[in-house]
Amino acid sequence: MVDRRPHLGGNLYCEDVEGIHVHKYGAHIFHTSDKKVWDFVNSIVEFNRYTNSPVANYKGKLYNLPFNMNTFYQMWGVTTPAEAKAKIEEQKAEAIARMKADGVSEPRNLEEQAQTLIGKDIYEKLIKGYTEKQWGRKCTELPAFIIKRLPVRLVFDNNYFNDKYQGIPIGGYNVLIERLLDGADTRLGCDFFAHREELEALADKVVFTGAIDEY
């Protein structure tokens, strides 16, 4: 196993900060609906039952994500799927009408695309700012194809994932990685491409997990 970083685990690597396992490269939640997979990883290290339920803050008001009935209640005060669906359809129709008034039939940018999929309110409060920060450009300057669809759940469920099993290894991902690699020859701080010929000669098959366009 070769890693050009000075530690095991790649993007799963955790740092211990005052006894807290901090995901150095962003939060990672393990999730699967396959019981065999779940049983396998739990045979290596015990997982907790963490449920990812994000919350967005827009001008001091909190909204549950992903978009579900809790979100729609917080947004509009609606309490039934029928009310939420009617509100979304109403705003989608308004977005399409604005486009037609401009003489266009298809979304010209991400803003128009998002509003025809989910309506103005959710777009303005929960999509626009995040997207513009992520891309460093205004949504009106981004192509429509970036957003193909926006999942909407007409149930009161804040669970981000649909998978049956999810969690984080107790003790952090480092424990999982170290046990998976127990007995394996590892080289850290080693650039695969700087020693490619030598390393490829050591194995019948290479599994590359870096940036695909580097290989």
Tell me the role of every PLM-derived stretch:
Residues 1-18:
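Glycine-rich FAD pyrophosphate-binding loop
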Residues 2-4, 32-33, 171, 188-190, ...:
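Short His-Asn-centered micro-motif
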Residues 9, 20-25, 189-215:
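Central helical "cap/lid" subdomain
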Residues 24-28, 166-167:
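A short acidic, glycine-rich active-site loop
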Residues 37-41, 176-180, 209:
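PAPS/PAP-binding and catalytic site of the sulfotransferase fold
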